[in-house]
Swiss-Prot record:
Name listed for the protein in its UniProt record: NADH-quinone oxidoreductase subunit G
Similarity comment: Belongs to the complex I 75 kDa subunit family.
Species of the source: Pseudomonas putida (strain ATCC 47054 / DSM 6125 / CFBP 8728 / NCIMB 11950 / KT2440)
Reaction equation(s) it catalyzes: a quinone + NADH + 5 H(+)(in) = a quinol + NAD(+) + 4 H(+)(out)
PROSITE patterns reported for this sequence: 2FE2S_FER_2, 4FE4S_HC3, 4FE4S_MOW_BIS_MGD, COMPLEX1_75K_1, COMPLEX1_75K_2, COMPLEX1_75K_3
Cofactor note: Binds 1 [2Fe-2S] cluster per subunit.
Gene: nuoG
Record function comment: NDH-1 shuttles electrons from NADH, via FMN and iron-sulfur (Fe-S) centers, to quinones in the respiratory chain. The immediate electron acceptor for the enzyme in this species is believed to be ubiquinone. Couples the redox reaction to proton translocation (for every two electrons transferred, four hydrogen ions are translocated across the cytoplasmic membrane), and thus conserves the redox energy in a proton gradient.
Domain 4Fe-4S His(Cys)3-ligated-type: 83-122
GO-annotated biological processes: ATP synthesis coupled electron transport
4Fe-4S as UniProt keyword: yes
């Protein structure tokens, strides 16, 4: 710690920070533009000027940029010095010479950092009366709108996009006061993290195009703390609603998880919530709409006296899955995961529970100095993990700078010292990945061969690990190099997962973790699982969806209740058809119109994450609560959307002719926690419904929320009472606590007086860029218990394909491989058409060129798909894009036959 003196007051700060960060962490206001907590300091904008003095006797001082000045012990500065204030005001005035006067029509208005800083400096009159420079805007795709005339040349966008996120297609062009930030030509931004430009940019150059179609100001939206359902990373989000529609998603700061950034699937994939074809009223197969009571009575009549299987879902909350389990009984509750996937998730859970190495948070991943990714294309399967791994490789430059006594926040100096030096990253994958540019070495092979390399790495680290027989010299040498790098590191990281449908990859990663622990390495093990609640569902229990369908087909059960799951996306259609035909009753509760919904005798409209509350468990084992953003019945009383657990419990009560016991979320959460030992901690994932600050509930709406009394004027001139939330500590109102002075974990939206932009998160943190003052949201359910794993010995044989027989393997796409986000219109523009990928050698042998139409038979399913030649894919492999339309599920690892050019 260090003592600095600010305007005569002695204050304790972190001496490793710069003055800007230190002062902001103290709650003091200094305007800034180019600095960002995740990007460091470059001193480009000159906005954060303060007066620095030699000591308490110095009355003259000198102006310095606070972001470029260390917070050294004994530093004397003044923020309120008149010369400094005049300097800061003049900087804003210079920026305004070319900035348009378009705040009323600018989509950044109301959450604009430039507006905040302009007000903070006191600039309120423009004296510049001459021609402004103008630019041509670009079409950057379906996610980002571009208005270059608003640029203030802070360089944040390119520093984030190129230096932080690793993008290559956004740059800066021009010179002096006429620079242009964009692409060489119009086109879709290629980075999977481009959406963060909308929050990184302090002005309205880059704005959310998905919000533009139905735009409103930030102060006119209703928010709630939520969790992204797009993958298993568990990123925290703030969805905003107006008039019963989700309008945008903003990043919600969690210092242990996503910090300041989201992937584009998580930010822009919310459109399925607003789809017109969603189930909104209970409906019979003939199209008859029912009310709430009639639907429950009908469902009870259909199910009474029958043996019911309940099929849950890894995209549904723990509470909803538990509600289904209580309805049908634990014996007849099924997880909803395909058999192979469930086995792999269970294996991952067992490994994490008993691993000798801890499970890292997303933020922890950034602090490792050697990484081995085994079998995962992280950018496509867990994008936010990929971004964290990219930051881990860049830690080498910071370490080199530290050795030269250069502060890590001096961004340009650190890069100059590092000269592109990176910590070692090794990637073993099917084909090329978006992280290859920062990898020391990459190897591409079949899943079995990747696993063999992993087992060989473990043996090279510790000879007591099982050896791999028949490994060729090249692979053995690679395994030795990977092992040497992991052992040489202070904090190595191993990342694997379930994606390639081969449990041997997880077992190999577990062996590496055990070997590293035996070498006394302070490492970590991270395992990627498929969906938002896959790990939580494995903790809750339940067999596979295959077993559920078998039970119906065999006559063991004659009724099916499906919760938030499309069975046709899990197992082959023929098996689903057989089970649904055998079932006397099929009831589906879901928030989206799926093929399974179309086959239901009764559909119950379930809440999406925006209309309900619940708990998810991320791949880290972190239980996190998501909260209802809005009540859909407020604007349309005919809507009967309810959380899955409410439907299930009400149906159970109707069947048993008993009163409803679970009247609020806390009741079902507590019951679920008691039923599954590993889920006992979920009650602590968020405050209870009784939580208050200064006697008030927490406001979902900003103080300036407008139009509430007029929103239903077209329905009735009589204003109803606002919805009452009995489930949580939040109010559907601006009436409640919304400030930053009182520490709290669950923050619906970031706002503080004078801070309307996302930079308002400064006011909620223990130190800027650190953690929330009340602690980061969520509770970890998995903590390392020491080494309780034995060596995994089932090492697969080498992949040796027979001529004319291929093996199907999955390629993943951030846009398209996840079910719900693929229903969002902007995301659909980014989803590729279905294809089949082959190695160049295989294409040559078949005599076909790129784009040729091929026919093939995989697991009994005939397909006709265009060819994509992949230079990195191994021989004997046929890659198919998982989740894309036309690609059947549960085929990966199966044999492919009849591969040939299709007859025209």
């Amino acid at each position: 710690m260090a003592t600095i003196h600010v305007d005569g007051k002695a204050l304790e700060v972190n001496g490793a920070d710069n003055l800007l960060q230190a002062c902001l962490s103290l709650g003091l206001d200094i305007p800034y533009f180019c600095w960002h907590p995740a990007l460091g300091s470059v001193g480009a904008c000159r906005q954060c000027a303060v007066k620095q003095y030699t000591d308490e006797n110095d009355t003259r001082g000198r102006i310095v940029m606070s972001c470029m000045t260390p917070a050294s012990d004994g530093t004397w500065i003044s923020i309120d010095d008149e010369e400094s204030k005049a300097f800061r005001a003049s900087v804003v005035e210079w920026l305004m010479t070319n900035h348009p006067h378009d705040c009323p029509v600018c989509e950044e208005g109301g959450h604009c950092h430039l507006q905040d800083m302009t007000v903070m400096t006191g600039h309120n009159e423009r004296r510049y009366r001459f021609t402004k420079r103008t630019h041509q805007n670009q079409d950057l795709g379906p996610f980002i709108a571009h208005e270059m005339n608003r640029c203030i040349a802070c360089y944040r966008c390119v520093r984030y996009y190129k230096d932080y996120a690793g993008g290559t297609d956004l740059g800066v062009y021009g010179a002096h006061d006429n620079v242009y930030f964009g692409r060489v030509e119009d086109g879709v931004l290629e980075s999977e993290f481009s959406g963060n430009l909308t929050e990184v940019c302090p002005t309205g150059v880059f704005t959310d195009k998905t919000h533009s179609e139905r735009y409103n100001r930030k102060w006119d939206m209703q928010f709630a703390p939520s969790i992204c359902h797009g993958c298993s990373s568990g990123c925290n989000i703030s969805p905003g609603e107006r008039y019963g529609e989700l309008r945008r998603i903003e990043n919600r700061f969690n210092g242990s998880v996503n910090q300041y950034f989201l992937c584009d699937r998580g930010r822009f994939g919310y459109g399925y919530v607003n789809r017109k074809d969603r189930p909104r009223q209970p409906q019979l197969a003939d199209g008859t709409k029912l009310g709430l009571d009639a639907a429950l009575d009908k469902a009870a009549d259909l199910l009474r006296g029958r043996t019911i299987v309940g099929i849950g879902s890894p995209r549904a909350s723990l509470e909803s899955n538990y509600g289904l389990r209580e309805l049908v009984g634990a014996e007849y509750f099924y997880s909803g995961m395909e058999a192979g996937e469930l086995a792999r998730v269970r294996l991952a859970l067992n490994v994490l529970n008993n691993s000798p190495l801890p499970v890292p948070t997303l933020r922890d991943i950034e602090d490792h100095d050697a990484v081995f990714v085994l079998g995962e294309d992280l950018t496509q399967t867990a994008a936010r993990v990929a971004l964290a791994v990219r930051q881990a490789t860049k830690g080498k430059a910071e370490a080199m700078a530290e050795a030269m006594k250069v502060q890590p926040w001096l961004d340009a100096a650190v890069k100059n010292i590092g000269q592109h030096a990176l910590y070692p990253l090794f990637i073993a994958s099917l084909a090329e990945t978006k992280l290859d540019d920062v990898a020391e070495e990459c190897v591409h092979a079949a899943p079995a061969d990747l696993a063999r390399i992993g087992f060989a790495v473990a043996h090279a680290i510790d000879p007591s690990a099982p050896a791999v027989a028949g490994l060729d010299d090249e692979a053995q040498a690679l395994a030795q190099r990977i092992a040497d790098a992991l052992v040489a590191a202070k904090r190595p990281l191993v990342v694997a997962g379930t994606s390639l449908a081969d449990p041997a990859l997880i077992e190999a990663a577990a062996n590496i973790a055990k070997a590293l622990k035996l070498r006394e390495k302070n490492g970590s093990l991270s395992l990627v699982v498929p969906e938002a609640n896959s790990l939580g569902l494995a903790m809750l229990g339940g067999e596979s969806v295959d077993a559920a369908l078998d039970a119906v087909i065999s006559g063991k059960a004659d009724a099916i209740v499906v919760l938030e799951n499309d069975l046709y996306a899990r197992v082959p259609a023929a098996k689903v058809d057989a089970a649904l035909a055998a079932a006397k009753v099929v009831i589906v509760a879901d928030h989206s119109k799926t093929a399974t919904v179309d086959r239901a005798h009764l559909v119950l409209p379930a809440a999406s994450f925006a209309e309900g509350d619940g708990t998810l468990v991320s791949q880290e084992g972190r239980a996190q609560r998501f909260f209802q953003v809005f009540d859909p019945q407020y604007l349309d009383s005919s809507i009967q959307i309810h959380e899955g657990w409410r439907w299930m419990h009400a149906l159970r009560a109707t069947l048993l002719n008993k009163p409803v016991d679970w009247t609020q979320l806390d009741h079902v959460t507590s019951a679920c926690a008691e039923a599954a030992p590993q889920l006992a901690g979920i009650v602590n994932a968020a405050p209870s419904a009784a939580f208050r600050i200064k006697g008030m509930k927490l406001a979902r709406e900003p103080l300036r929320y407008s139009g509430r009394t007029a929103m239903r004027a077209n329905i009735s001139v009589h204003e109803p009472r606002t919805p009452q939330d009995k489930d949580t500590a939040f109010a559907f109102s601006m009436e409640g606590y919304s400030g930053s002075a009182e520490p709290r974990q669950q923050v619906p939206f970031a706002w503080s007086p004078g801070w309307n932009s996302p930079q308002a998160w400064n006011k909620f943190q223990d130190e800027v860029g650190g953690h929330l003052r009340a602690g980061d949201p969520g509770v970890r359910l998995i903590e390392s218990q020491g080494d309780r794993l034995n060596w995994f010995n089932a090492i697969p044989g080498a992949f040796n394909p027979a001529r004319g027989i291929w093996t199907a393997v999955p390629f993943f796409h951030l846009f398209g491989s996840e079910e719900s986000s693929s229903r969002a219109a902007p995301v659909q523009e980014r989803i590729p058409a279905a294809y089949v990928a082959l190695a160049k050698s295989e294409a040559d042998r078949l005599g076909v060129n790129d784009g040729a139409l091929l026919s093939l038979n995989v697991a009994g399913v005939a397909l006709r798909l265009p060819l994509r030649i992949n230079e990195e894919l191994g021989a004997g492999l046929v890659a198919l894009p998982k989740g894309l339309a036309g690609i059947p599920p549960a085929i990966f690892g199966a044999s492919v036959e009849g591969l040939q050019e299709a007859a025209q």
